[in-house]
């Protein structure tokens, strides 16, 4: 029998709650069993404080992921997970875990080679039960691969990561609009979201048949064009010491097999419990405050605006010829 996910001591012997019943709890504390589909997931130490300044707990994170599960699971399903665990909250340094050796029966794993050539046992996101399992391990942010298990060498999208590294957020928004302009000139659409930290991610959906090398060449071409159109605002220079003050780093190098980025609707291990939230291009143009997107505000935003990122799953775009050459 494979071990479960109780991480300390005996679980309190109580009947399993449905996800709806869990959300109705006025106070989430101790240990709980929650039914997720036909599975029962043990959730432990729910009153452990993860964000000391706000008093947000592990239970608050789990509550959030249950609230947004019907949305986030569309973007996680069938993707290998890179776990970044904060079992004691954000006040302590987290750690990466890709090789997971012991899993309950309801969590799928797949042995894959990482970029260094090592064979690792990756958790595969499949349903609410698997999501709750990894969150219970202290995995605050969800970092899936860009490809699914059926087509591991073919990413579903290209990612352009706008990293301010000290530049004003207003500059990040300006650079995002340049990214949109470059994509339009190429006949492509992109979907922006906050990184959940200090930047913006632009995701470009692509059709089947493109490998990671093609995705990377396309991302590099877009990034170089952005930097050439707005040299005072943007750069593709990796060395921080070589960048001009106030430039936003246009990072295209996350487009490789085994790389990941925080999923849309993912919580981040950052102050205020911010969330990587989809935004409209009109919001990019008008400006907004990153602090407005947290575990306390995003569920209501979803109810009002729906899933602003769903085009990523519906749209299929062939990469321009430049990405297929060489």
Residue ranges with predicted function:
Residues 87-152, 158:
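Basic, low-complexity intrinsically disordered segments
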Residues 180-194:
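Active-site palm subdomain of RNA-directed nucleic acid polymerases
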């Amino acid at each position: 029998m494979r071990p479960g996910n109780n991480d300390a001591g005996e679980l309190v012997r109580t009947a399993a709650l449905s996800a709806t019943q869990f959300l109705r709890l006025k106070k989430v504390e101790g240990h709980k069993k929650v039914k997720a589909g036909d599975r029962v997931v043990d959730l432990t130490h729910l009153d452990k404080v993860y964000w000391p300044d706000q008093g947000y707990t592990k239970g608050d994170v789990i509550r959030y992921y249950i609230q947004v599960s019907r949305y986030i699971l569309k973007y996680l399903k069938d993707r290998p997970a890179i776990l970044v665990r904060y079992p004691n909250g954000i006040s302590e340094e987290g750690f990466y875990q890709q090789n997971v050796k012991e899993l309950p029966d309801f969590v799928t794993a797949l042995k894959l080679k990482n970029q260094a050539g090592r064979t690792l046992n990756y958790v595969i996101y499949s349903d609410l039960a698997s999501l709750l399992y990894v969150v219970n391990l202290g995995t605050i942010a969800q970092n899936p691969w860009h490809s699914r298990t059926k087509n591991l060498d073919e990413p579903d999208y290209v990612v352009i990561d706008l990293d301010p590294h000290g530049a004003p957020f207003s500059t990040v928004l300006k650079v995002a609009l340049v990214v949109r302009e470059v994509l339009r000139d190429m006949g492509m659409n992109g979907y922006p979201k906050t990184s959940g930290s200090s930047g913006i991610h632009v995701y470009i959906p692509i059709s089947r048949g493109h490998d990671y090398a093609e995705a990377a060449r396309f991302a590099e071409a877009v990034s170089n064009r952005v930097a050439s159109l707005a040299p005072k605002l943007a750069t593709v220079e990796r060395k921080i010491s070589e960048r001009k003050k106030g430039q936003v780093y246009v990072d295209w190098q996350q487009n490789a097999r085994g790389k990941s980025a925080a999923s849309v609707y993912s919580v981040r291990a950052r102050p205020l419990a911010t969330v990587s939230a989809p935004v409209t291009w009109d919001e990019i143009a008008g400006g907004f405050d990153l602090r407005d997107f947290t575990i306390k505000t995003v569920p209501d935003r979803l109810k009002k605006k729906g899933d602003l990122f769903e085009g990523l799953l519906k749209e299929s775009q062939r990469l321009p010829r430049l990405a297929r050459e060489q």
